Amino acid sequence: MGESQSKQESNTRVAQHGSQQDVDPTFQTKRALERERSSPQVEQSFLGQLQSLLGWSSTSKDVPLSQLIREMDHESRRHSHQSKKKLDRSEHISEGTIPEIYEKRKETISHTQSMEQKYLFQNFTKLLLLQKCCPGGSEKLVRESWHPCVPEEGGHMIEIQDLFDPNLDTEKKPQLVIIEGAAGIGKSTLARQVKRAWDEGQLYRDRFQHVFFFSCRELAQCKQLSLAELIAQGQEVPTAPTRQILSRPEKLLFILDGIDEPAWVLEDQNPELCVHWSQAQPVHTLLGSLLGKSILPEASLMLTARTTALQKLVPSLGQPHRVEVLGFSEFERKDYFYKYFAKERNTIIDFNLIGSIPVLLTLCEVPWVCWLLCTCLEKQMQQGEVLSLTSQTTTALCLKYLSLTIPGQHLSTQLRTLCSLAAEGICQRRTLFSKSDLCKQGLAEDAIATFLKIGVLQRQPSSLSYSFAHLCLQEFFAAMSYILEDSEEAHGDMGNDRTVETLVERYGRQNLFEAPTVRFLLGLLNTREMREMENIFACKFPWETKLKLLQSIIGEPFCQPCHLGLFHCLYENQEEELLTETMLCFPLTASGPNHMEATVFQTNVKRLVIQTDMELMVVTFCITFSHVRSLRLKGKGQQEYKLTAPAMVLYRWTPISEASWKVLFSNLKCTRNLEELDLSGNPLSYSAVRSLCTALRQPGCRLKTLWLVDCGLTSRCCSFLASMLSAHSRLAELDLRLNDLGDNGVRQLCEGLRNPACNLSILRLDQASLSEQVITELRALETKNPKLFISSTWMSHMTMPTENTDGEESLTSSKQQQQQSGDKHMEPLGTDDDFWGPSGPVSTEVVDRERNLYRVRLPMAGSYHCPSTGLHFVVTRAVTIEIGFCAWSQFLHETPLQHSHMVAGPLFDIKAEHGAVTAVCLPHFVSLQEGKVDSSLFHVAHFQDHGMVLETPARVEPHFAVLENPSFSPMGVLLRMIPAVGHFIPITSITLIYYRLYLEDITFHLYLVPNDCTIRKAIDEEELKFQFVRINKPPPVDALYVGSRYIVSSSKEVEILPKELELCYRSPRESQLFSEIYVGNIGSGINLQLTDKKYMNLIWEALLKPGDLRPALPRMASAPKDAPALLHFVDQHREQLVARVTSVDPLLDKLHGLVLSEEDYETVRAEATNQDKMRKLFRGSRSWSWDCKDHFYQALKETHPHLIMDLLEKSGGVSVRL
């Protein structure tokens, strides 16, 4: 029984991982070497060194080694058995059947080696897959390196079983799936996994009856094929007659691996001229007809290609599913190492963590590099060397591989020949070579055997052709060939020019720096790597070769500034002089027909989409050599600060690994010009914060401003932050808001702030949850250190509408209103929050703003309604009711309701005297007018001390559910879900528009959310933190559906990020989705629109006029009643402003024409010092109107924001009139 169970486990694991022969092209060589090892102790020693080198620690979670070996043996026997299956020649074969074509095909072309060839990467469980958006067809299939406008959305992560899932917009299953990605990232591996999983009955069996796998590099060897012959090639053994297979074309899947490799043009033939399936035609025409749907239009296709090759490959690909392979996750990198080195049957070693070489681990995101690294380590072990790898680039790793595998310098001549073969193949887009090709090139028989043995070359199973172990390896050898050619004196400058021309002709000007050959070439021109090449080839390279080639490539006029591909090339080169010269000579504002200048808040702010850890590493590495002063890594729900130009914003849709954080922060140790870093919205682990603070302590780090808003920091992280502040860091501004630091964490920060070496001048953190003792400690620190300004999101200066003595509406700070009300714990809310009853409005008071707790005193029996919250109370007598705003997330996530019910309205915590309330109407946002929702599905959830209770309301009205004789606890409306309906529930929604003026630019935030007062309040508070003001515009008239997507557009040319909004419910405590709209000049106004993405019908529009916009000014503090007159903010702080305004001329420029005449402007400017200029300005201000002083205040706020914020915090409010 044990043996049976073992076999069963083996079969299961093999289905997931594949065989060792699939893993490695040098499998047989490895087995021979294993037999040559002297003892198991050698292996044990090696594994111990490996564990030490890579920083792994042991766990008990991985599969035992013995089991893995059994799986490998089983899979090897299974493939051996399959390969021996032959057709019975005595079987009767009719014309056009699969067996006949199968046998005929064997005589003309080698069998497709999709399942038997010794590939590199079949021993991993899964790859990171990003399903991308493809709006409007396939006009732009290639992801641009620079995005003047960031894509509407970055897509979402999927699994292999989701490749053919229905399109979210059309609900149609795709017929074409494009697997794209960088070189060596695992595209072919994924395609083979699909075929293998289907063969073994694990994937897509319900959708496809036949799956055919084709290697396009092998198909390209054929001149002509019929459709029947093509189908025969796609099967390991014949399964059914051709006619029977073609009778259900909708059940067929054709997998075309490496569609971009051959040098062909796939042309669709005229549908009227389509030939019979048994008639041969040129291969490229046959494939072009498949792609163009001229033949088998109902069939499905899966293509794999490098991303850069897609656009010119096929003119039109309809509406494909585009899936980008992003390589290994950090866990899968570790898993790959485990499987690669799991060889000794009696040794069980579980590797859990890779941490000591973050750059190498980031490089290993690419599966091919993983294999390369493992091979190098294994070669070192075989040669008895101490395990050590210091390679920082893929190029250096390839050279290390060569130095470890090439047996001595006597092969240097043959190695040159192999390089020439590789270069010729790259130019001709050939990856398969016949024996005669190798001999014609000058490769000797013994050299070919050696290259096969060491794994540089591999023989195809048919023995008819050879190839490099991987296309990337061929490209590396081609790059070496160009170095060898250009080093010959006979070529001189002409050789350099010819090399560049050859590369441009092969890859195109736009994609030159995306080509691995070019990246390897730049890497080989590194001083250290050229010395390594000299050792390998036993020759000397003139240094002029290096300089001239670099100049030829980087100095070309088509070299695009700040191109992601160029960043990769510069990273491979690693030469500081080249990096500095290149990065500093390119402006950040791109120009030209393909590069529109991108303006965020200003010019010189560029956006770049990065998808992988590798891309993040190379970009941040190059940035440290540039003139970029501000860097933002865009996080989810992140509010943006104004960045100092030149700046760069990086967008990423996938999680960042721990190794990648370490590399990023390591690059900050010497930042040159980088002074601002915004990581807000990105979750930072304990170890990531430690790496960050270590970098900030380095003398070469010049960062002055660090934003860590909403990064998931805890008190545990504060010890590192405090240590960094105490270590002579240059950091002057630190924002830690929306992090749960707690009293203990803030106390640790205070220790760092007290250190005389601390240079911090601005600290922003939340104080609402802090104890009075800690807040007092912070204030004492400010008093002791006048240069330190501690800002808070504590709303002590929140303002509310009141009536001034003239009967006009003014604004009063909540702090002063508390004093005027006679209750220091209460604040009156505005009239929108009043309860309207029999005697008119009843004001609502704030009990605790931070806890969202309010109170209303209803004076008599009757019905009361609050328009703002939607709450109704029917009371029998005077009663005081307390109302708290809650978040569903804190109650629902531990109950089964989250799977069976959807939130249908806000959640309130209501407290009232028992028996005083006879009915309560709880608001909901489900639209009943559509007639699609049964009112019996509504429930009111009570969250009580003893558990949760669902209660059926007495009745359900269009906007609320009525609960009679209620008992109170946290309560709200839920809707029971019906599986057939899913989430397609019509709801009432609202649009919220906020704006902020900065200089001449206007930034709008547009939200589309359910009509939930708690969400609206949370958004209001969040926007207020960043001084955005809400504009009231009508909501959508019709009901909308949760999960639907809407396109945001404008009547003018504006920048909208993202261009789509999804209507979804998010808890008030979560970040809400919004579109950010940048407007340089609003002119007479702009028209904003929301259009249903699926049906393209207009669902909402609003006209924003200049009159809708008012400066985003803080609120005004009321003067005491006995005050003779209300002083404006600028008059209240005249002394401070005269003493502390350090730059008057920009202030005067803003007032010129609005407040100051030409004569006044020149008179003030003529004063000798800033203080004299300010005194002269204030003397003239005595005759200014209140509006003129408002302009003065706004100009001060724009030119001296920190000063104004400091004065606001200390005064508790601002006296301005809107």
Swiss-Prot record:
Entries under Gene3D superfamilies matching the protein: Death Domain, Fas, P-loop containing nucleotide triphosphate hydrolases, Ribonuclease Inhibitor
Region span, ZU5: 835-968
Site feature (Trigger for autolytic processing) residues: H942
Chain coiled-coil ranges: none
Binding site for ATP: G181, A182, A183, G184, I185, G186, K187, S188
Annotated site residue numbers, Cleavage: F968, S969
CDD domains: CARD_ASC_NALP1
Residue stretches of biased makeup (Basic residues): 77-87
Domain FIIND: 835-1118
The protein's assembly and partners: Interacts (via LRR repeats) with BCL2 and BCL2L1 (via the loop between motifs BH4 and BH3). Interacts with NOD2; this interaction is enhanced in the presence of muramyl dipeptide (MDP) and increases IL1B release. Interacts with EIF2AK2/PKR; this interaction requires EIF2AK2 activity, is accompanied by EIF2AK2 autophosphorylation and promotes inflammasome assembly in response to danger-associated signals. Interacts with MEFV; this interaction targets Nlrp1a to degradation by autophagy, hence preventing excessive IL1B- and IL18-mediated inflammation.
Protein known as: NACHT, LRR and PYD domains-containing protein 1a allele 3
Source organism (scientific name): Rattus norvegicus
Lineage: Eukaryota, Metazoa, Chordata, Craniata, Vertebrata
